[in-house]
Design a protein with these regions (language model features):
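Nucleic-acid endonuclease domains
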Residues: 1-115
Length: 115
């Protein structure tokens, strides 16, 4: 196990100095059907989490909600609860075409010592 951890970093991608962990979550519904949410594990030392959230139950990666979350905004949590109208969706949701340019902008900030 010691060697496994050493050879397999806790992030999925490295982009120009940024470490990125990619996550996916199905849409969870409460038994009463009134509440929907997603769950993500946030453990790790990555710079960002890119989360793909199932838009409708059963739709999987068909037009998912996408979140770009800098780890500085996550406090020592191991699980992140994301509601459909909560802070995480409102503050960190990005459109698919915005994801790559935003990551490149952050990589440039890192290169210039500003992040």
């Amino acid at each position: 196990n010691k060697y496994f951890k050493k050879n397999n970093p806790v992030y999925d991608f490295w982009l120009d100095g940024l470490t990125i962990d990619v996550k996916y979550s199905s849409l969870y519904k409460r038994k009463n059907g009134n509440s929907h949410h997603w769950q993500l594990r946030t453990k790790g030392n990555q710079d960002f989490i890119v989360a793909f959230l199932e838009r409708e139950s059963g739709s999987e990666l068909e037009e998912p909600n996408i979140l770009l979350i800098p780890m500085q905004f996550i406090e020592e949590q191991k699980e992140l609860h994301i509601s459909q109208s909560g802070r995480w969706i409102n503050d960190f949701q990005v459109e698919p075409e915005e994801l790559q340019p935003l990551l490149k902008d952050y990589a440039l900030l890192r290169k210039n010592g500003l992040f």
